[in-house]
Amino acid sequence: MSRLWLIVPAAGQGRRMGAECPKQYLDIAGRPVLAHTLARLHEAFPEAALRLCLDPDDTRFSPEWVPFADWQRVAGGRERVDSVENALASLADVAADDDLVLVHDVARPCVAVEDLRRLREALTTSPEGGLLAAPVADTMKRADARGHVVHTVSREGLWHAMTPQGAPYRVLCRAFAHARGAGVVLTDEASALEAWGLAPRLVPGRRDNLKITHPEDLALATRLLAGDPASRRATGALSDDSLADEARS
């Protein structure tokens, strides 16, 4: 049976938050965002091995926040893609070609355990990789340089990409290498797979798997982790069945 490897890039500075510290160290109920995220991943995959990408000069990190027995600190890069590539390189001597690698944003502490497990199960039969995602529900507008509407964009077939995203180890490595050689700008793992000609599988996930990017996101994540029903309604969080129904509509 293949192993599961988790990569969590956590070397970013989170400048859009405008906070005094990187967003992975912002406090939620007495613990940093990073600790909440790792705890959620561990609840779903206690047997997984973790590669945690941190800034080499990071002095805020504490190993006590890592619940995994098998984990390793990896030097983070200038950009997220650099951190992920460093983590993939660290697995060269230990990961098998068909081992599953999942990459998760450290700033997504609200990801549902059932979604994590469902993603892993889906990717056992998806050699081209895949990702958690949610169908676009809002009306989408294309804007001009002045911030005025140019036209309404059809939301048919549009999805919000989330994380985790992943693929078998060899597939992900080759996709990243191809993108690097072709000069493709990568925003996530799925874009690397796409650039290599693959079609990653979209696995429906809850909408409350939000990424903490702006100050209001932190407040919402705090309420979500506390189990506030109103906050779940505000994010449009749906059950697995309703997400699947919407994806088909």
Curated annotation (Swiss-Prot):
Cross-referenced Pfam families: IspD (PF01128)
Protein name, entry field: 2-C-methyl-D-erythritol 4-phosphate cytidylyltransferase
Source organism per UniProt: Chromohalobacter salexigens (strain ATCC BAA-138 / DSM 3043 / CIP 106854 / NCIMB 13768 / 1H11)
Gene3D superfamilies: Spore Coat Polysaccharide Biosynthesis Protein SpsA, Chain A
Keywords: Isoprene biosynthesis, Nucleotidyltransferase, Transferase
GO biological process, one term: isopentenyl diphosphate biosynthetic process, methylerythritol 4-phosphate pathway
The protein's annotated pathway: Isoprenoid biosynthesis; isopentenyl diphosphate biosynthesis via DXP pathway; isopentenyl diphosphate from 1-deoxy-D-xylulose 5-phosphate: step 2/6
InterPro entries: IspD, IspD/TarI, IspD/TarI_cytidylyltransf_bact, ISPD_synthase_CS, Nucleotide-diphossugar_trans
Site positions (Positions MEP for the nucleophilic attack): 155, 211
The enzyme's E.C. designation: 2.7.7.60
Reactions that this protein is recorded to catalyse: 2-C-methyl-D-erythritol 4-phosphate + CTP + H(+) = 4-CDP-2-C-methyl-D-erythritol + diphosphate
Function as written in the Swiss-Prot or TrEMBL entry: Catalyzes the formation of 4-diphosphocytidyl-2-C-methyl-D-erythritol from CTP and 2-C-methyl-D-erythritol 4-phosphate (MEP).
UniProt-listed NCBIfam families: ispD
Record-level Gene Ontology MF annotations: 2-C-methyl-D-erythritol 4-phosphate cytidylyltransferase activity
Family affiliation: Belongs to the IspD/TarI cytidylyltransferase family. IspD subfamily.
PANTHER family: 2-C-METHYL-D-ERYTHRITOL 4-PHOSPHATE CYTIDYLYLTRANSFERASE, CHLOROPLASTIC
Record site feature (Transition state stabilizer), residues: 16, 23
